[in-house]
C-alpha cells in the first residue's frame, strides 16, 4: 500500500538524531528495496498504537464476566479495576501470596511451590511509525513496561504476537516483517530476555505485540497499592506521542496540515516525531530498578487511556484513602500548541490523549523523589544509542508532576496545570507558565 508522496522523517535519525539510535541502525528507505517511494507502514491499519484501546467504562463491563466467583469478603488480593491490559485470564490457583488479577497492568499468580509468583502480561497494537524496525522495538518496550511498572527488572521469557496484513504484496511482506521481528527481538535482548515463540496469523491489519513472563520472589516486585498522603507523583517520559505521530502524517494531508502550520514548522514536526519514536522505544527498566532503591509505593505505565485514565485506575487500587492531584504536564515541545490548534482533538491538556509505550507514573516518598529524578538523568541503562562509540547525551529525564493527598481514591488534573515544554534532544529545558502562577505549589517543583 502506498501514497503519492514518500514518508517523511524516517531517514536514519536525520537532523542530528542518528547518534541516539542503536548502533548500526538504518531507517527503511523504501526505494532502495524496490518498494514504492510512498510506502507507509501505517497505511496497513486504520488505528495507531495504544490508541486502539477499548474505552475504560466499556472495558470495565466486559471484564466483569471474567471475574472468578468468590464468597463475599474473601481475600483475593488487590481488587480489580480497569487497567491498561486484561493481563492473564486464567484461573488463579489456591496458592497463598499476593495476587493481582484481571484489569491490572500485569497478573500476579502465586505458584504452588517455593513461595514464588508468576507475573505475566500481554499487549499488542497497530503500527504508528513508518519504520518497521523501530515499530518492533516500540512494541516490545510496551509489553515489558507492564512488568517494569511493578518494579520488576528481569523477564524470563517473551512470546511474539504478529499478524501479517493480507493487503501486503510479497515484496513488502518479505522486507517489512523480518525488520519488525528483529526490532522486537533486539529490544527483548536489551531487556535481558529472549523471544522463544509466539503466534503469526493473516489479518487485514498489521498487528505486533507479545507476552512477557517472569517467576518472582515477593521482594522482586512492588504491589501497586501502597501510596500514602504526602507522596509525590513522578513521570518518567513526556506526554504527546500520539500528537507527534499524527502531526507527522499530517505533513502530507493539506487540509490537516493547514490547521497546525501556524504553530509549528515542518522541521519541528520531524523533530517531534523522532523524539516520540525514541521515547517510545526506550525501556522503562531504569525506572523499575530505581523504584526499589527509592522506596516507591505504587506505579503504573501510561498508555492507551492517557495519564489521567491510568492515574485514576492506580488511585482506585490503593489501600489507603488517597487522591492523586496532577499539577505539571511534561509534553514534547510544540505538541500542546498542536493539540490546541487542532481543536483539542487529542485531549492532551486534559490528560486523555493516548500514549504508546509511555513512561511510568510512580508514587514516591517526597524526600526521595528528587534523588530518583537525578539518578534517572545520570543513568544510561536502557537508553537507545547508549552502546554506540561516542554516544552522547544523559539518561532519561523524569519530572515531579503532582502530589498524593488524603481523598477518596480518585485522580484529577488541576484547572490550569503547568505545561513543561520538553525540548527535542540537545536543547535546553524550558517551562511555560500557565496564567495561574500558583498552579504548582512550592513542594511540587521540578526535580
Swiss-Prot record:
Could you say which residues bind ATP here?
A: 53, 103-105, 123, 146, 197-200
Which tissues and organs express this gene's product?
In the embryo, expressed in retina, olfactory vesicles, tectum, pronephros ducts and myotomes at 24 hours post-fertilization and in retina, tectum, liver and intestinal bulb 3 days after fertilization.
Cofactor binding mode, per the note? Answer: Binds 1 Mg(2+) ion per monomer.
Q: Which residues form the signal peptide?
A: none
Q: Where is the active site?
A: 50
Annotated GO biological process: selenocysteine biosynthetic process
Cofactors needed by this protein, per the record, are:
Mg(2+)
Please tell me where Mg(2+) binds in this chain: 105, 146, 301
- Give the Gene3D superfamilies listed for this entry: PurM-like C-terminal domain, PurM-like, N-terminal domain
| Matching InterPro entries | PurM-like_C_dom, PurM-like_C_sf, PurM-like_N, PurM-like_N_sf, SPS/SelD
Q: Which terms are listed as keywords in the entry?
A: ATP-binding, Kinase, Magnesium, Metal-binding, Nucleotide-binding, Selenium, Selenocysteine, Transferase
**Which residues are tagged with the site Important for catalytic activity?**
53
Could you tell me which SUPFAM superfamilies the record lists for this protein?
PurM C-terminal domain-like (SSF56042), PurM N-terminal domain-like (SSF55326)
Family of this protein: Belongs to the selenophosphate synthase 1 family.
Cite the NCBIfam families for this sequence.
selD
The task this protein performs is described as: Synthesizes selenophosphate from selenide and ATP.
Task: Describe the protein's quaternary organization and the partners it interacts with.
Answer: Homodimer.
The protein here is known as: Selenide, water dikinase 3
Native species: Danio rerio (Zebrafish)
Amino acid at each position: 500500500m502506498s501514497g503519492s508522496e514518500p514518508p517523511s522523517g524516517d531517514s536514519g535519525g536525520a537532523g542530528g538524531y542518528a547518534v541516539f539510535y542503536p548502533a548500526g541502525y538504518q531507517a527503511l528507505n523504501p526505494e532502495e528495496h524496490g518498494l514504492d517511494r510512498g510506502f507507509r507502514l501505517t497505511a496497513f491499519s486504520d488505528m495507531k498504537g495504544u490508541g486502539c484501546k477499548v474505552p475504560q467504562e466499556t472495558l470495565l463491563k466486559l471484564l466483569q464476566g471474567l471475574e472468578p466467583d468468590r464468597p463475599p469478603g474473601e481475600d483475593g488480593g488487590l481488587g480489580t479495576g480497569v487497567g491498561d491490559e486484561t493481563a492473564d485470564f486464567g484461573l488463579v490457583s489456591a496458592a497463598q501470596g499476593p495476587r493481582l488479577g484481571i484489569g491490572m497492568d500485569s497478573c500476579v499468580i502465586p505458584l504452588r511451590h517455593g513461595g514464588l509468583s508468576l507475573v505475566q502480561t500481554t499487549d499488542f497494537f497497530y503500527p504508528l511509525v513508518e519504520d518497521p524496525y523501530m515499530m518492533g522495538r516500540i512494541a516490545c518496550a510496551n509489553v515489558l513496561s507492564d512488568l517494569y511498572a511493578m518494579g520488576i527488572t528481569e523477564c524470563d521469557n517473551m512470546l511474539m504476537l504478529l499478524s501479517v496484513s493480507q493487503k501486503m504484496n510479497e515484496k513488502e511482506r518479505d522486507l517489512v516483517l523480518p525488520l519488525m521481528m528483529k526490532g522486537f527481538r533486539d529490544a527483548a535482548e536489551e531487556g535481558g530476555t529472549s523471544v522463544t515463540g509466539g503466534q503469526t496469523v493473516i489479518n487485514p491489519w498489521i498487528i505486533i505485540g507479545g507476552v512477557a513472563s517472569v517467576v518472582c520472589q515477593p521482594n522482586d516486585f512492588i504491589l501497586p497499592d501502597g501510596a500514602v498522603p504526602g507522596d509525590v507523583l513522578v513521570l518518567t517520559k513526556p506526554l504527546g506521542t500520539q500528537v507527534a505521530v499524527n502531526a507527522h502524517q499530517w505533513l502530507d494531508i493539506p487540509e490537516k496540515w493547514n490547521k497546525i502550520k501556524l504553530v509549528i514548522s515542518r522541521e519541528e514536526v520531524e523533530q517531534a516525531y523522532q523524539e516520540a519514536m525514541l521515547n517510545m522505544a526506550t525501556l522503562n527498566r531504569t525506572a523499575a530498578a530505581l523504584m526499589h532503591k527509592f522506596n516507591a509505593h505504587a506505579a503504573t505505565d501510561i498508555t492507551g487511556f492517557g495519564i489521567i485514565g491510568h492515574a485514576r485506575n492506580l488511585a482506585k487500587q490503593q489501600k489507603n484513602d488517597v487522591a492523586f492531584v496532577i499539577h505539571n504536564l511534561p509534553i514534547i515541545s510544540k505538541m500542546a500548541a498542536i493539540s490546541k490548534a487542532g481543536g483539542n482533538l487529542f485531549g492532551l491538556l486534559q490528560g486523555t490523549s493516548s500514549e504508546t509505550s509511555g513512561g511510568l507514573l510512580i508514587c514516591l516518598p517526597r524526600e526521595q523523589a528528587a534523588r530518583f529524578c537525578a539518578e534517572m538523568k545520570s543513568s544510561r541503562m536502557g537508553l537507545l544509542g547508549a552502546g554506540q562509540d561516542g554516544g552522547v547525551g544523559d539518561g532519561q529525564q523524569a519530572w515531579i508532576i503532582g502530589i498524593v493527598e488524603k481523598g477518596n481514591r480518585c485522580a484529577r488534573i488541576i484547572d490550569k496545570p503547568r505545561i513543561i515544554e520538553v525540548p527535542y534532544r540537545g536543547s535546553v529545558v524550558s517551562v511555560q507558565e500557565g496564567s495561574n502562577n500558583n498552579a504548582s505549589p512550592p513542594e511540587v517543583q521540578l526535580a
